[in-house]
């Protein structure tokens, strides 16, 4: 079933929805971020990974500073319309630390 931005339940979590970013080819999870309506609209329009920074309270595009952009190939919405997956082709590391993925620390 196809969904539109109007179907997304932004209010469930205070205006934001979690976005899982996944490599479109390998299906590896690259990172988890959050989007508000405006950043999701930008992502859909530009096909680049846009998010809302909870710490800086502003929109940001992955790679705007590092150059490590992510081209969105597909946007998927979960069954409750309160979480999203961006399937992307990354141009470099996903993590701000320079690691390929953000999930590189094992919980012991």
Curated annotation (Swiss-Prot):
Cofactor(s) for this UniProt protein: Mg(2+); Zn(2+)
GO cellular component assignments: cytoplasm
UniProt keyword Protease, yes or no: no
Cofactor note: Binds 1 Mg(2+) ion per subunit. Binds 1 zinc ion per subunit.
GO MF, one example: phosphoribosyl-AMP cyclohydrolase activity
SUPFAM superfamilies xrefs: HisI-like
Alphabetically ordered keywords of this record: Amino-acid biosynthesis, Cytoplasm, Histidine biosynthesis, Hydrolase, Magnesium, Metal-binding, Zinc
Top EC group: hydrolase
Subcellular location: Cytoplasm
Pathway: Amino-acid biosynthesis; L-histidine biosynthesis; L-histidine from 5-phospho-alpha-D-ribose 1-diphosphate: step 3/9
Record family assignment: Belongs to the PRA-CH family.
Subunit structure as annotated in this protein's UniProt entry: Homodimer.
Annotated protein name in UniProt: Phosphoribosyl-AMP cyclohydrolase
The gene coding this protein: hisI
């Amino acid at each position: 079933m196809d969904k539109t931005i109007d179907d997304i339940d932004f209010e469930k979590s205070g205006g934001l929805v979690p976005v899982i970013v996944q490599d479109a080819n390998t299906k590896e999870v690259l990172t988890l971020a959050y989007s508000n309506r405006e950043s999701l609209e930008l992502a859909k329009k530009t096909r680049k990974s846009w998010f809302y920074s909870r710490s800086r309270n502003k929109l940001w595009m992955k790679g705007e500073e590092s150059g490590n952009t992510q081209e969105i190939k597909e946007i998927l919405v979960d069954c409750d319309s309160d979480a999203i997956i961006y399937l992307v082709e990354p141009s470099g590391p996903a993590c701000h630390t320079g690691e390929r993925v953000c999930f590189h620390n094992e919980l012991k």
